[in-house]
Amino acid sequence: MAAKDDLILTIDSDGDEIVYSEESEAEVEISVKKVKNKKNKKSKAQPQQKEEDEEKNEDINPNFIFSLDGIETTSKFDGWDFSVDRNANEVANKEVDLDGILRRKGGLVSLAGSDAQKEEEVEDEEEEENDEDIQNEDEDEGEEELALDGFGMGAEEKVIDEEDEEDEEDENDKSDGEDDKDTEVEVSEEGEEENDEDTAEAMAEFYADEKETKSAKSQVHTTFQTLQLSRPVLKGLSQLGYTKPSPIQSASIPIALLGRDIVAGAVTGSGKTAAYMIPIIERLLYKPSKVASTRVIVLTPTRELAIQVGDVGKKIGQFVNNLNFGLAVGGLNLRQQEQQLKSRPDVVIATPGRLIDHIRNSPSFSIDSLEVLVIDEADRMLDEGFQVELTEILSLIPKNKRQTLLFSATMNTKIQDLIQLSLQRPVRIMIDPPKTAATKLTQEFVRIRKRDHLKPALLFQLLKKLDPAQQSRIVVFVSRKESAHKLRIVLGLLGMKVSELHGSLTQEQRLNNVNDFKKLIVPVLICTDLAARGLDIPKIEIVINYDMPKSHEVYLHRVGRTARAGRDGTSISFVGESTSDRNIVKDAIKSLEGGEVKGKAVSRNIDWVDVEQLNKIVESKQEIIEEVLDEEKQAKEILQAEMQLAKASNMMKHEKEIQSRPKRTWFESEKDKKKHQTEVMQQLTKHGKKVNSKKRKAIEVKKDDGGRSYKKTKVDRITDQKRNPKAKIGNGSSKGGKRRK
């Protein structure tokens, strides 16, 4: 038996095959029988389990949603953080150190009109409390609903090469001059608002069926997951802390995913940027991976808005593979942008002038494969100043199979302007703007009367009283750039840290000032309406209207910077004696009296004796203010001379290389450009004066009609009566018939 057990069978052994096959078949038969027995048992138990499952399902919430990849919404997202890449070889541009000048003149040391020791004690106590406040802020930030058009400005600016600086400055003036203009909101002399309404027939002829619009607005999505978005996009949204889409997003995203053209209107802060960026990223998930091409172009009126949109797209698409964004805006390095556009990024965010410049002069940049065109802030893009640039861009962009998305805070343009955009049966989505302020906003009004000269001292007294430790974000709105700059100097000499934001600053200065304000390095930001448009920084506690706006809508836009997402906020307005100022106050009070809003509108009591004492200090520093302005002007001239000297030396060193470069071209000659500007000014002015909206509208209608309309003369009326004598005797169809009766 031992020998038989030790016997090793060969491959040719028949016994091995027979024994192995019999055993395997037996095992298979046994396993099959066991499975059949299990199935029989299961089939018998099925009716009982069905009854139990039905009882359990009654307790299950049908609206339950699983957490995506186990990622919870972040609670530490503090606004948009955008950064601009910088080459290691680049040297930062020199700017005038205004703070250094103010320190040499005795400013930025201690607050005027207060005891320095008391201020130091207050600062020590505030530092201890601030550590606790920072922890509480991190916990509370998850409760804040940040507007999707907000952004952080943590950017280091790209710097222009010295030999290219003057050329690029000329191009910026030519292509993006619109970014540096601070224009006031136009209001008619009679207080009438411009209202370009189209007939119902024309709108029905141009827009898609109203049923689509109604169905789009009626769809209410409680979460982004019900929008049937892909997992990478949902993951990016969850990382940003966004779970519930806003009304404009809920209505426009499904339509945009179908490839339809959209004309959408919603107020600033409603999430317009994500409303078009989410469907764009969703569409780019299915792009051909082998061929790199620019498929999306987003047009914005300002540089800051373009940089913000780029950061929003990067944050939402951070988990999408091979998704690239490019930037084409003025004020940044032109050569570096050309290198970036050579890689043909999927999405290019641009201002109109710089985009035309790159299309005409950058050899490797092509838009032949463009699929989606987005026009953000369309109300400004369709103004007379941008009309020529838009026409040129639309003539260069392919029309076939192109989806056009048009978004705006206000939409009062004519049908003919939209037809020029080559929209094909667009779906019209208009979300009604709020005509009242936030519920937890306290609106305070200070009646200035005939004390306009005390406004700088009044502003300093309020800032010192409201925020003695300078730990709150305060935005001060002014109407002019000169006022913003002078206020910064005055408050700086009085010992207060202040920054400014307006069109006269360079791009690097703008970004640095907003970044310092966001990080509370500088707690007060003085800005104009145009510079602050589209800018949304979280947790602004106080808004001060140093100069009242021109309309109630602009007033709501200003005070809407604070009291967001159920937080408390305060707005303080310096009200003058003009009719427009009083009307704004009346409208604000009326909105509260209607019972729709629970906010408060109060008159703030001011210690005018203290303000007059502070005004004496301000007046005593008038000579120092003039010295600061002169020194700043001289420093700017020195920097300009140094730049010209560096450029001349570079021209001598690299003369052949610079002359070998092809000359950059523009679609308009200087003669045509001046002609267009004069035509625009003629439409806006008459005999050197501003024309109100009613008269300007009549001028436009007359221009469109192409001349004076024909009116019947007396001879024509007599001949008509002779042809139709019954009209003379009949029902009094003519005035002559009535007289004869």
From Swiss-Prot:
Keywords for the protein's UniProt record, in alphabetical order? ATP-binding, Coiled coil, Helicase, Hydrolase, Nucleotide-binding, Nucleus, Ribosome biogenesis, RNA-binding
| Helicase ATP-binding domain span | 253-429
Name the residue ranges with Basic and acidic residues bias: 652-672, 698-723
Q: What class of enzyme is it?
A: hydrolase
Biological process annotations from GO:
rRNA processing
UniProt binding sites for ATP: 266-273
Tell me what reaction this enzyme catalyses: ATP + H2O = ADP + phosphate + H(+)
Segments of skewed composition (Acidic residues):
118-147, 159-200
The UniProt entry, under PANTHER family, shows: ATP-DEPENDENT RNA HELICASE DBPA, ATP-DEPENDENT RNA HELICASE RHLE-RELATED
Kindly provide the name given to this protein in its UniProt entry. Answer: ATP-dependent RNA helicase DRS1
Q: Which organism is it from?
A: Scheffersomyces stipitis (strain ATCC 58785 / CBS 6054 / NBRC 10063 / NRRL Y-11545)
Highest classification ranks of the organism:
Eukaryota, Fungi, Dikarya, Ascomycota, Saccharomycotina
